[in-house]
Design a protein with these regions (language model features):
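Short, Lys/Arg-enriched N-terminal segments with co-localized hydrophobic residues
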Residues: 3-18
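C-terminal substrate-binding/catalytic lobe of Rossmann-fold NAD(P)-dependent oxidoreductases
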Residues: 22, 33-34, 41-74, 170-308
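Rossmann-fold NAD(P) dinucleotide-binding segment
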Residues: 74-77, 91-110
Length: 346
């Protein structure tokens, strides 16, 4: 029924009519499927096409009216979609794909390698400006919603301390690292905030916390037959950049237990700023923002789709180049008019 409504959907605001925002998805993994589901909940949008590196005949999507095409066919859709959402990985896909496709489409990505965001921004900005397109990068919850809350909190409380805690939730990157270990058949890793550290921040103690003091890691590992459990546990706990700096617990479980008890991809976390105001800094304040997510990729996708609306609107205004969540006014995200927002949410 929703897709029938979308086919007929014309929004009228102050006498102006416009059709649905036509979305393309590049990459159909967990994030791509999440974007497809999110589009279904936004009646001013329609999914037009999914681009895949796989054989299109092997890709089964949920939207009956959308097409599945090879990535090599993307250029043929240059004038058929309004925004292309890039759902690849940050390690190797997005650094290449986002600048490339910003020369053809208005684009949105979820690039999350924090240290490389300035470089990625510059590359996308150059490509988008040359093509007269608009790109929004690093959209999601961290970077994304957490970033916005850090910025707001720092602007409001210029004297203070920032804290970010992640979890409890599945870290897909750390889970991948576990699965790369010889003898590991499958695995999930949870990042867990240290409750005493979180409470110290909430109490206004402004603690100086090490990596180990902020989070613990819990691993659920399925072994290949005959694998050396002691060796694997030691290798996990000593793995640099992933587990060596944390108190890590390793559980060896069956494949069935992993699938039934750890089949989801939950996540979340906290962004806090503890600060002071007053002539003599006599008053303390705490700003806390929390996310608790059943599905990390589906929530990330929902944020991305809201920013796809912003990309469409900014492009319609003639804006070009790259943007981040810092650069975009909140009203651009909403399907509601400014008049309605002021009447109902302000």
């Amino acid at each position: 029924m929703l897709h029938l409504l979308r086919d007929l959907f014309i929004i009228k605001r102050k006498g102006e009519s416009f059709m649905s925002i036509r979305i393309g998805i590049l990459g159909y993994g967990n994030l791509g499927r999440g974007v497809e589901c999110a589009i279904r909940q936004n009646l001013d949008m329609e999914l037009a096409v999914v681009f895949t590196r796989r054989n299109p005949e092997d890709v089964r999507i949920l939207t009956e009216t959308a097409k599945v095409c090879r990535v090599s066919e993307a250029e043929q859709w240059k004038d058929k979609i309004d925004v292309l959402i890039l759902c690849g990985g940050s390690a190797t896909d997005l650094p290449v794909q986002t600048p490339k496709y910003a020369s053809l489409f208005n684009v949105v990505d979820s690039f999350d390698t924090h240290a490389r965001i300035p470089e990625h921004f510059a590359n996308v900005d150059e490509a988008a400006k040359q093509a007269g397109k608009l790109g929004i990068i690093s959209v999601g919850w961290d970077p994304g919603m957490f970033s916005l809350n850090r910025m707001y909190a720092n602007a409001i409380l210029p004297e203070g301390s920032d804290y970010t805690f992640w979890g409890k939730g599945v870290s897909q990157g750390h889970s991948d690292a576990l699965r790369r270990i010889e003898g590991v058949k499958n695995a999930k890793q949870y990042t867990i905030p240290v409750e005493s550290a979180l409470e110290a921040v909430r109490a206004g103690e402004n603690p100086v916390l090490t990596t180990r003091q902020k989070h613990t890691r819990e691993c659920f590992v399925v072994l290949e037959e005959g694998a050396d459990a002691a060796r694997i546990e030691k290798e996990i706990k000593e793995m640099p950049n992933y587990f060596a700096d944390y108190d890590t617990t390793v559980h060896f479980i069956s494949e069935e237990e992993l699938l039934t008890q750890h089949g989801g991809i939950p996540h979340g976390g906290f962004v806090l700023r503890s600060g002071v105001t007053g002539w003599n800094r006599e008053n303390r304040h705490l700003i806390e923002y929390r996310l608790k997510l059943d599905s990390n990729p589906e929530f990330t996708s929902s944020v991305i789709v809201a920013y796809a609306r912003a990309a469409y609107r900014l492009a319609k205004e003639g804006q070009t180049g790259c943007r981040t969540v810092f650069d975009i006014a909140p009203a651009y995200l909403s399907p509601t008019t400014g008049e309605e927002l002021r009447a109902t949410m302000l």
